Amino acid sequence: MKFWGWMHHKFRENSKEPLKDASTGNSYSILSAHPSLDSQEVYPTACAGSRYNTGFRKQVNLFQESSFAGPKQYTEEDFKDERNSDFFDGFLAIGTLGGETLLDEQPATPTFGMSFEDPAIDDADVTENDLKLISNELDKFLEAEAKEGHHQPSGRNSDTNTIASTIEAIEGVDDEEDNQPMKFPLQEYFFGSLIELPESKIAGKKDRASLGELFQITEVQDKQSENIYGKKKKQPNSAHKSAKHLVKKVLKKIHPSSRGSVSGKPEVDSTKKKFQKMVQVFHRKVHPEESIMETKIYSSVANPKSSKANSIDLTFEKVNHCHEASKRCIQYELRSSRSAKNGEHWIKTDEDYFVLEL
C-alpha cells in the first residue's frame, strides 16, 4: 500500500505542470507530460499481480479525467476509500500487502439511541418522590385522626392513647390493672392470643389442707414406701436361695460318693487314696522298671525264704540291663558318626519313648 501511495504522490506532482500548460492552451504538453501505459515504470506494476489490475485501471482513469477536465482537488481520503473498496470487489486480499492499513483503521464505536445515564440516579429520584408523597399522605391522615379524637373521644384510639395505656400497664398504677394481664398493641398480631396470667393466680388461691389431712397423707405415703422396700428385699433372698440350690446339685453330680458319707473324714481318706493311685499309675507309665523292682521287693519281704534267690536274680537283671544300655549307646555313636559323614542324622523311634496315657 505504501507503493500505491508513492505512485499517487508522483501522479500529483506530474499533474501540476500539465495543468499550468492547459491554462495557456497547449493540449499536447498535457498528453506528453503523463506517462503512457506502455512505459517501463508502469508496466511492471500492472503485471505484478492480477488482483491489483482493477485498482490500477481505476487510478489511471481518474488521472486521465483530472488531467483533461482541468484542476480538481483529489484528497488522500477519497483515494483511501477507493483503494479499500478495490480489495473487496469479489475477492479477498491474501498476504501482508494491505494488512497494515486495515489493522490501523479502528472500527467506529457504535452509537445507540439509549441514554447512558446511571439508572441508580433515576431510581433514587423516584424513591425520593415516592417517599415525599407517602409522608404527605400520612401527615394528612394523622391530622384528620387527631381532629376526630378531639371532637369524638369515643372514636378510635390514636397512637398517643395506645402508648399511654401501655405505660400505665407497665407501671402498675392501679391494683385492678395489676391483676389483669398487660395488653400490648401488637401482642395479638404476633402471638395470636394474650398471655394467660390469671389462671396461675387462681390456682394459688385454692383452700389449704388441714393438719389432720396432712398427717393422713404422710402415713399413707410411708406405708406405700415400706411395701415397696419389702418387695425389693424379698427378691434378692429368693435369688440367693436358688443359687445355693444349684451349687449343691452341681457338687452332688461331681462327687456322687459324698451322698453316703455322713462325716468329713471318710471323704478326706478317699481323696488321699485316689491321689496315691494316680501317682502309682504315673510312675508305672514313666518308669516301668522301677515298678517291677518294687513289686519284687514287696514279694521278698512277704516271703523271706525266696529272698536270696530273688536278690541274685535282681543283680543279674541289673547287669544285663546295663550291658544292653551300653550296647545301645555304642550303636548310637557309630550310627551318628556315619550319618555325620553322609550329612544324615538318626531319628529315634517310638520304642525309645514311653507314652504317658492317663
Curated annotation (Swiss-Prot):
Q: What happens when the gene is disrupted?
A: Defective shoot gravitropism. Increased angle of inflorescence branches.
Instruction: Kindly list the cysteine pairs connected by disulfide bridges.
Output: none
According to its UniProt record, where is this protein located?
Cell membrane; Nucleus
Main location per the UniProt record: membrane
Cellular component per GO?
nucleus; plasma membrane
Q: Which UniProt keywords apply?
A: Cell membrane, Growth regulation, Membrane, Nucleus, Transmembrane, Transmembrane helix
Substituting L92A results in: Switches the shoot gravity responses from upward bending to downward bending
Q: Which domain of life is it from?
A: Eukaryota
UniProt motif IGT motif: location: 90-96
Q: Which GO terms describe its biological process?
A: negative gravitropism; positive gravitropism; regulation of auxin polar transport
Q: In which tissues is it expressed?
A: Expressed in shoot apical meristem, vascular tissues, stele, endodermis and upper portion of the inflorescence stem. Expressed in the endodermis of inflorescence stems and hypocotyls.
Residue numbers of motif Nuclear localization signal?
Answer: 231-253
* Residues that span the membrane, as ranges: 87-107
Q: How does it sit in the membrane?
A: Single-pass membrane protein
**Role according to the record:** Involved in the regulation of shoot gravitropism. Involved in the regulation of inflorescence branch angle. Functions redundantly with LAZY2, LAZY3 and LAZY4 to control plant architecture by coupling gravity sensing to the formation of auxin gradients. Involved redundantly with LAZY2 and LAZY4 in the regulation of both shoot and root gravitropism. Mediates gravity signaling in statocytes downstream of amyloplast displacement, leading to the generation of asymmetric auxin distribution in gravity-responding organs.
Give the family this protein belongs to, as stated in its UniProt record.
Answer: Belongs to the LAZY family.
What is the name listed in the Swiss-Prot or TrEMBL entry for this protein?
Protein LAZY 1
The organism that produces this protein has a lineage beginning with: Eukaryota, Viridiplantae, Streptophyta, Embryophyta, Tracheophyta
Gene that produces this protein: LAZY1
